[in-house]
Design a protein with these regions (language model features):
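Conserved SAM-binding loop
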Residues: 1-2
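Conserved SAM-binding strand-loop segment of SAM-dependent methyltransferases
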Residues: 9-23
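Conserved H-loop
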Residues: 10-11, 27, 128
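A short acidic, Gly/Pro-enriched loop at the edge of an enzyme's catalytic core
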Residues: 19-34
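A short SAM/SAH-binding and catalytic strip from SAM-dependent methyltransferases
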Residues: 32-46, 69
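A short glycine-rich, Lys/Arg-flanked "PGG" loop and its adjoining helix->strand segment in the class I
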Residues: 47-62
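C-terminal alpha-helical "lid/dimerization" subdomain adjacent to the S-adenosyl-L-methionine
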Residues: 66-121, 125, 131
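Core SAM-dependent methyltransferase catalytic element
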Residues: 119, 123-147
């Protein structure tokens, strides 16, 4: 990522930080925006991680989360369930020694709150204007919220 920023001459404008969202010690009110792609469902404590990100955001700062979701429309829902129950684990056994990795993804998606519930959790933690948009036939959602 750092190399890409340098090539685009953005390395002085954008900084990349490595850390744990639940315990990150960045200063209060220090970030204009926080983006997370396919990571929030892996938080050990969802509300704690979201609250810590809220603490770090400046007033009016934006949170954008891209996360997998479970499609609700026929026939996408049925194909999705079939694929994750039968095809994904079979491919995992055929091509990988770590078959657990191929069962973890559908399990973690199933355990993650649905779109309305996750939006409610964002608001419970203290975010304002929490909303979501389904993308990819409902296979993922983009959540937006503001401090």
């Amino acid at each position: 990522g750092r190399e890409k920023l340098q090539k685009l001459n953005l390395d002085k404008t954008i900084t990349l930080q490595y850390g744990d969202a639940e315990t990150c010690d960045l200063a209060d009110n220090s970030m204009d925006a926080i983006t997370v792609g396919f990571g929030v469902r892996n938080f050990e404590n969802l509300e704690k991680g979201l609250a810590n990100m809220l603490r770090i955001l400046k007033p009016g700062g934006q949170l954008c989360v891209l996360e997998f979701s479970s499609p609700q429309q026929f026939p996408v829902k049925q194909f999705y369930k079939f694929h994750f129950k039968y095809i994904t684990p079979t491919l995992g056994r055929m091509f990988s020694k770590d078959t657990r990795a191929y069962t973890y993804l559908p399990e973690s998606i199933k355990a993650f709150p649905d779109n309305e519930r996750f939006t409610a959790i964002l608001e419970k933690v203290g975010y304002k204007k929490a909303s979501f948009s389904s993308v990819g036939l409902g296979l993922a959602a983009i959540y937006m919220a503001e401090k």
